[in-house]
Every structure is written in C-alpha cells, then in structure tokens.
Curated annotation (Swiss-Prot):
Residues 379-472 form the PA domain. Pfam families: fn3_6 (PF17766), Inhibitor_I9 (PF05922), PA (PF02225), Peptidase_S8 (PF00082). It comes from Arabidopsis thaliana (Mouse-ear cress). Optimum pH is 6.0. It comes from the Eukaryota. Keywords: Extracellular matrix, Glycoprotein, Hydrolase, Protease, Secreted, Serine protease, Signal. The keyword Transport does not apply. GO terms for biological process: proteolysis. This is Subtilisin-like protease SBT1.1. The active site is at 152 (charge relay system), 225 (charge relay system), 552 (charge relay system). CDD domains: PA_subtilisin_like, Peptidases_S8_3.
C-alpha cells in the first residue's frame, strides 16, 4: 500500500530524480497515519528547500508507521498544488498539529495562510500613438510570436476580439494545454487563445464549492474582467466596437498579434493566493513571455507576498511580469505589487470623455460624466438623504434605504461610498427613481467615472457636487435637468486617476513606485456574454464591449506594450523592457503642460513619481530608448541582502542557498540598478548625503555622447559623476554615481521630486527622483 500511495501521488521513472520537496510532502502526508490531530484546518502556502533524490523519498517512505490508520480522529491533509517553477513548495489544508509537524521537518522554510486577493477593477491604443499599418503596427514589427499569460477571471473564447484569422500556427515552443471544464471544451482554443487552465482549489478551501449556477468551474469567464483585460492586451482589431453607441471606433489590443494563455484564478469573491501562485507556476512551465496580473493584496514584506515571490520565479525565467498598482488612491503609501522585479502600473485618463450637463434650478450648469445616450431629462424634482428615504443609508443609496413614495419619478442624489456605484443605481431604479446623480466625496475629488448604470445616471466631481448640495439645501422645490452629450474627444490628458494607488512603497521605500501609468479610466474592451455590464444580477443587458475603470485596465496596456517591445527586441531581459518603458515615458499632456493628478490637492496639481512613476507610457519611444538599466537575478538577490533579509528569507526567492556578497553590508537598497531614484532622509539625523551607483547599457546609436541634465528636488543638491558618458559601440556598459546632499532637515515628513536625464541626439533617457524626509 505504501508504494501504491507513493506512485499515485508522485509518479516518476527510474531515470528521473524526485525533487526533495516532493519527498518532504510524501513524508508529512503519510506520517499522520501514526498520530491524532486537532480538527481545525486552514490552507497554507508552504515553502521548501529545492534539493532532490529518489533515495530520500524512498527512505522516508519506508520509515513510516501506519498502525493508527483506522483511528476515528484521523484527519488527512489536503494537498492542493505542488509548485516547481514560480517557487519551491506546495499548498495544503492542514490542522494545527499537521502544520507543526511540517514546520519541524527538514527542508521546511516558511508557511503563511492562504488569503483572497482582489481584482483591481478601445480607443486607448490610438491615444498612445498606435495605428494599424503605421510605425510599430506595421507588418515587419509584428512578425514574431509573443505569448501573454493573463491570470484573471478567465476568458470568453468566442468573442470577436479573439479570432485567429490570418494567424500563423501555434509556436512549437508552446508547452501549454487547453483544459476541459464546465462549458469549456478544448476546441474553444485556437491560434489566438492557445492555452486555458482554471485554478480553484485554494478558493474552494476558503469560500466553499463554486456556485456553478453563477460561475463556471473552468476557464470560461462568467464575470467579464478577464475578457476585458485579455482583449486590452492582445485582442484582435475590431471595427465599430462600441457600448450602446458610445465610444464607437476601432478596438484593439496593444499587441493584437500576440497569443493569449488564459489562467483563471479569480472567482466571484476574489483570487486565492495559492491559486494565483499555481497559475503563475503553470504559465512559467507553459512558456509564456509576459504575465499580466490585474490583482493584488495589501502591501506587505516581500517574503510574505505571494505575487512578489512567484513573480521573482517568473523573472528568473526571463518572463516580464506586469501588475496593477491597486485602486486605493489617492491616499499615500497604498501601492501594492511593489517588488522591483515587477512592473507596477498606475491608471491614467485618455482624452475621451462622456459629458453630461446637469442644469440645476438656479441656472447653474454642472459638467459630469454618463454613458447614457437617451433623451434629455427636463425639470425633474431632486431627492436626497431624508427626502429620499428614512434609513441612515439613504445618503449613499444603499440597498433598501430609499422609499418609493419619496423618490418615484425624481432625480435621486447619491454620495459615493458604502456600496458599489452601479448598485446605487439599482436601488434608485428599484425605488422608482427616474435618474441618479452620483456625487464624489472630497477624497475622490474631481474624478468622473462613466459606469454602465441600469438607469440614466451622471457622475459629478466633488466641487460640482458641493454646488449641487448647497443649492438643494437652500431651495424649497429643487429641480434639475440633464442633457447627455454622448462621446467627446480632446479633453486634457493624460492625467493620473484619483483612485490609482500611490507610493511610496511600504515594503521597499528605496524603490520609487509605481513605475509607470497607462490608460485605466473608462476603457472600452471585450466582455463576457454571461455577465451584465453593471455586474448586477438584476440587469438583463448583455454587451460585446463594456466600459470600466481601474488599474486592472491599465496593467494589460503595459503587458501588451511589453509584448510589442519583446517582438522587436527578442533578446531583451524583463528589466531592459521595463527600463525602456520607464525612461521614455511622457511627462506632459496634450496641452504641453505637466501631467496632472486628479487625486492631488488643487485642480492644477502636477503628478509626482509617487502617482505615475516615470510618467505615462509612450510605446513608440519605448522601442528605441537609447540606454537601458539592466538588472540581473543576482542584482535582485543583493537587493534583498541590502534589506537585511535572512538567508532563509532569501532562499524563498533564490530557490537555492545564496551567500550575500561581502560588501552587501555597505550597499543600500537604493543601489539597485533601477531606472528611477528614491532617496530617504531622516529628519534630524546625521545622514545628510546619499550616494547611488547606476550602470546603463547602450541599445541605441553605437557611438553616442550622452550629457547629463538634472532638475534638483527642492531642498537637495544633486551631483553626477561623470557628467558625460561616451559610448563607442552597441551593448557597451558605462557606470555613473549620483550624490544627493540634503540642504537642511524638514520639520515634518514630506517629499520633493526631480529628474535626471541623459541626452544624446534624439535620445532623452529620463529617470525620476523622489526624495522623502521621514
């Protein structure tokens, strides 16, 4: 029986050595036949050492005792996944006693509980300068195969964005599969969607069995989020795409000839970290070139961050990993996915808007945003708070808070917060309201989100909302009219979205995060036929394309652009691609003014490196950046050494023992060869000078003499040595040092920002500088 269990769990041939962690799993899996265990169970991510021999497995197996196999208190551990590519280890549901046994077994490194991560929930390609048949989108630059793996809610394979017309056969290097499942056949894949897998064991261990009346236990997308991100990154060109006539035009992914591999690890209530790791692990094994992750959790140390650890494994295999920054802005230090080997993407505006004019009874006009395209509403009475419902939640229009006798036929005012935006509209409609005015709070500022509401609705910024509420407070019979203007172009853009999470990074403050901004507000892309555009079950509408917002939408823009760069520069490392995207980013808008920040105090405030990183992505310039900052696995490991990580914690990333260099004690985390600079100064401390070293690689003109230009952060003197970098050949590497001298301490915590640029002919290699006083 011993041998049967061993072969059933871990089959192997005589000429294939077993990994040590597999022997470790067999050992703890079977050793519990000999002991009683406590009944409380929880799912864990477990990291183990990566050494292996079949002899160890056999010797452990032969040492087992099973005399208590029939004990009534016996509880079998549940092993969900074995991780071999993204990390070394496995996930399992264990009792407390079983976890203790695992911790005391040779080869164990660490364990932490599974958790649910959150999703960070088209014309944008044209706004970024990508047009069919021109420049980067001509046939020459699109000739090679690049595979984008998206970890999300799945995909809708029949969607028009995923046609494989004129695509070449699937690359022979592809090792993935198209897994069967509920309402998903292997025949659903084609030359565009070349891989499909679903991961739900971790989710079900936390939440319970998936409700297959509302979701599919397969890669099929029941929510729409995964279809939206996949079509944004790599969707085919679709003419006349629109949302009920709005935003009509050409829809396309950033790299429309790329292949797609869909890994469904996100379900109705979120994404279990164990499932996300399993999806990344499979993507690495399958052979993707880019991994796109529009999801994340709260910021935490990298050694307990599943995306940071699994993303490191992908980076080691030369895979570019793009992650959303999160939707917790504009509060500072909310950015997630901040590991330096990940590309962290903030959300920005395009110049496309959906204006609606609200004219209130005192003849003032307020400008909002709406996807409704019906007839105007004229002189309807307004209802708000106590004039709309008797419950305290009426101010937010939460479920069952409004009274029909108070709101029927009226325009209802709802404040943002406490419930979903489209759910507020559902409550207004349920209560007989004619329309909704959704007012931003001070925290949300002037953000104008165009949501797919179930009734006529207008989003208003904080200032106009305040004007509206002041009018309402002083009017006996307040009324309003609304005129819907459809789709408009030419608004000031780009601009950082207020909801986009901000730096500095809590886990790694010496690395400026986020890295880059990309379109993430009111983005049109493909949608699932099994989900309403509002995500409300009461909404019977079905659409081919939907308009939604979030850093979730920004992330696949960068994933697709990274694939585009990879198709032109197949030998570039993930760090080189990241550097090219960052150092060529735009910092001015379409009015030639500094890119603004919707979440900052003051309507004209310029965005900083903690809002948009290096700037807004410019794909055309990114393909020819001149210089790049390359970073190796060893560089990243030395960075972890500089964080004073123990050898055990570094082992989580390296997979094998890594000895920190003797000079690591004098290295700063800021010495990582990164395309931006984060300088941290402590008020009142003796440390007034910080010095960083950088090395750049010439990927532009073989001979070029770069001159440095510095715009100093307020309160800091910046010195660069040398001031000139003379390159004589392609791929030559030259180094420089930057010294930051604080002029004086600050009285409180604050930040100031500057820029360092290397200039030669057409090249402007720009790196942002962020200085923080603590």
């Amino acid at each position: 029986m011993h041998r049967f269990l061993l072969m059933l769990l871990f089959p192997f041939s005589d000429n294939r050595p077993m990994m040590f962690f597999r022997s470790f799993i067999v050992f703890f899996f079977l050793i519990f036949f000999a002991s009683n265990v406590s009944s409380r169970k929880q799912t864990y991510v477990i990291h183990t050492v990566t050494t292996s021999t079949k002899h160890i497995v056999t010797s452990l197996f032969n040492s087992l005792q099973t005399e208590n196999i029939n004990d009534d208190d016996f509880s079998l551990p549940e092993i969900h996944y074995i991780y071999e590519n993204a990390m070394s280890g496995f996930s399992a549901t264990l009792t407390d006693d079983q976890l203790d046994t695992v911790k005391n077994t040779k080869g164990f490194i660490s364990a932490y509980p599974d958790e649910l991560l959150s999703l960070h929930t088209t014309y944008s390609h044209e706004f970024l300068g990508l047009e069919f048949g021109i420049g980067l989108w001509n046939e020459t630059s699109l000739s090679s195969d690049v595979i984008i793996g998206l970890v999300d809610t799945g995909i809708s394979p029949e969607h028009v964005s995923f046609r494989d017309t004129h695509m070449t056969p699937v690359p022979s290097r592809w090792r993935g599969s198209c897994d069967e499942g509920t309402n998903f056949s292997s025949s659903e894949c084609n030359k565009k969607i070349i891989g499909a897998s679903a991961f739900y064991k971790g989710y079900e261990s936390i939440v319970g069995k998936i409700n297959e009346t509302t979701d599919f236990r397969s890669t099929r997308d029941a929510q729409g989020h995964g279809t939206h991100t996949a079509s944004t990154a790599a969707g085919d060109i679709v003419p006349k795409a629109n949302y009920f006539g709005q935003a009509k035009g050409l829809a396309s992914g950033m790299r429309f000839t790329s292949r797609i591999a869909a890994y469904k690890a996100c379900w109705a209530l979120g994404c279990a970290s164990t499932d996300v790791i399993a999806a990344i692990d499979r993507a690495i094994l399958d052979g993707v070139d880019v991994i796109s992750l529009s999801l994340g959790g709260s910021s935490r140390p990298f050694y307990v961050d599943p995306i940071a650890i699994a993303g490191f494994g992908a980076m080691q295999k030369n895979i570019f990993v793009s992650c959303s920054a999160g939707n917790s802005g504009p509060t500072a230090s909310t950015v997630s996915n901040g590991a330096p080997w990940l590309m962290t993407v903030a959300a920005s505006y395009t110049d496309r808007t959906f204006p609606a004019i609200v004219r209130i009874g005192n003849r003032k006009s307020l400008v909002g945003s709406s996807l409704y395209k019906g007839k105007s509403l004229k002189n309807l009475p307004l209802a708000f708070n106590r004039t709309a419902g008797e419950e305290s939640g009426a101010v937010f229009c939460i479920r069952d808070s409004l009274k029909r006798e108070l709101v029927e036929g009226k325009i209802v005012i709802c404040l943002r917060g406490a419930s979903g935006r489209t759910a507020k509209g559902e409550e207004v409609k349920r209560s007989g309201g004619a329309a909704m005015l959704l007012v931003s709070t001070e925290a949300e500022g002037e953000e104008l989100l165009a949501d797919p509401h179930v009734l006529p609705a207008v989003s208003l910024g904080f200032s106009d909302g305040k004007t509206l509420l002041n009018y309402l407070a002083g009017a006996a019979n307040a009324t309003a009219s609304v005129r819907f203007r459809g789709t408009a172009y030419g608004a000031t853009a780009p601009m950082v979205a207020a909801f986009s999470s901000r730096g500095p990074s809590v886990a790694g403050p010496e690395i400026a995060k986020p890295d880059i901004a990309a379109p993430g507000l009111n983005i049109l892309a493909g949608w699932s036929p099994f989900s309403s555009p509002s995500l409300l079950r009461s909404d019977p509408r079905r659409v081919q394309f939907n308009i939604i917002s979030g850093t979730s939408m920004a992330c696949p823009h960068i994933s697709g652009i990274a694939a585009l760069i990879k198709s032109v520069h197949g030998d570039w490392s993930p760090a080189m691609i990241k550097s090219a995207i960052m150092t060529t980013a735009r910092i001015t808008d379409n009015r030639n003014r500094p890119i603004g920040d919707r979440g900052a105090a003051g309507a004209e405030s310029a965005a900083t490196a903690f809002a948009f990183g290096a700037g807004n992505v410019d794909p055309t310039r990114a393909v020819d950046p001149g210089l790049v900052y390359d970073t190796s696995t060893v560089d990243y490991l030395n960075y972890l050494c500089s964080l004073n990580y123990t050898s055990e914690r570094i082992l989580l990333f390296s997979g094998t023992n890594y000895t920190c260099a003797s000079n690591a004690v004098v290295l700063s985390p800021g010495d990582l060869n990164y395309p931006s600079f984060a300088v941290n100064l402590v008020n009142g401390a003796n440390l007034k000078t910080v010095r960083y070293k950088r090395t750049v690689t010439n990927v532009g003109s073989p001979t070029c003499e770069y001159m440095v230009h510095v715009e100093e952060p307020k309160g800091v003197k910046v010195r660069v040595e040398p001031k000139v970098l003379k390159f004589q050949k392609a791929r030559e590497r030259l180094s420089y040092t930057v010294t930051y001298d604080a002029e004086a301490s600050r009285n409180s915590s604050s930040s100031s920002f500057g820029v360092l640029v290397w200039i030669c002919d057409k090249y402007n290699v720009r790196s942002p500088i962020a200085v923080t006083w603590e």
